[in-house]
């Protein structure tokens, strides 16, 4: 079992034009283990994406440490796949060549690349679109290609930064359900960022709520709505259930309370 640990991590940005430094994250502690689906929620500017970038190795913390297994995270690595809000696919390549691209950069042989790509395109329901060009696909299908590409490199962890933010409501629900089915079939660590409380509750096995800057984890919830969906198959019934609605209102109260507190701090600063 793999574990990614965030240990007392802080990040401070230097001030611009002789301005004061900005503390984006302060004293963040988090563990993500194989099979976890951790969702981060919080107001804009609370440091969710900053935390993901640190976990991905795109940035280094100002204090504290991030480790994967017994090794420090010192930069990007194939063991951590990233899916962005904008898909970052290569428009001059067709679907299957996009999915194979990461493995090609790693020097993996053509037969192995193709086998893995075919497997993961089937996993995201795109087994009939291998030769289609990216610009011929809908937004939801493009994001599914991005997920397949990340999975094809067989990372221990999948980091997802609001991958459904630009999708329409119906497509978003479809991709959410697909993502849970993939989670059920793969023993990986998932870290997912969203601004949607409903999405966070539906997807996460654990939900962390972050405070306004400096970002800290203020609340943690263990959830089972995702497992209920996988067992029952009725997303609408789960999202309209009394316990789901009660939890949603509780989380909204926390986030809106934090936003108001942050606004008051700015007013009195």
From Swiss-Prot:
Membrane disposition: Peripheral membrane protein
Residue numbers binding ATP: 42-49
Subcellular location: Cell inner membrane
Broad class of enzyme this protein falls into: translocase
Keyword Membrane in record: yes
Coiled coil (residue ranges): none
GO cellular component terms listed in the entry, alphabetical order: plasma membrane
Result of changing residue 40 to V: In strain: DSM 65
Major place of residence: membrane
EC number: 7.6.2.7
Cited InterPro entries: AAA+_ATPase, ABC_transporter-like_ATP-bd, ABC_transporter-like_CS, ABC_transporter_ATP-bind, P-loop_NTPase
Reactions listed under catalytic activity: taurine(out) + ATP + H2O = taurine(in) + ADP + phosphate + H(+)
GO MF annotations in UniProt: ABC-type taurine transporter transporter activity; ATP binding; ATP hydrolysis activity
Domain annotation ABC transporter: ranges: 4-237
Record CDD domains: ABC_NrtD_SsuB_transporters
Record keywords, A-Z: ATP-binding, Cell inner membrane, Cell membrane, Membrane, Nucleotide-binding, Translocase, Transport
Assembly and binders: The complex is composed of two ATP-binding proteins (TauB), two transmembrane proteins (TauC) and a solute-binding protein (TauA).
Similarity annotation: Belongs to the ABC transporter superfamily. Taurine importer (TC 3.A.1.17.1) family.
Cited function: Part of the ABC transporter complex TauABC involved in taurine import. Responsible for energy coupling to the transport system.
PANTHER family named among the record's database cross-references: TAURINE IMPORT ATP-BINDING PROTEIN TAUB, TAURINE IMPORT ATP-BINDING PROTEIN-RELATED
Protein name: Taurine import ATP-binding protein TauB
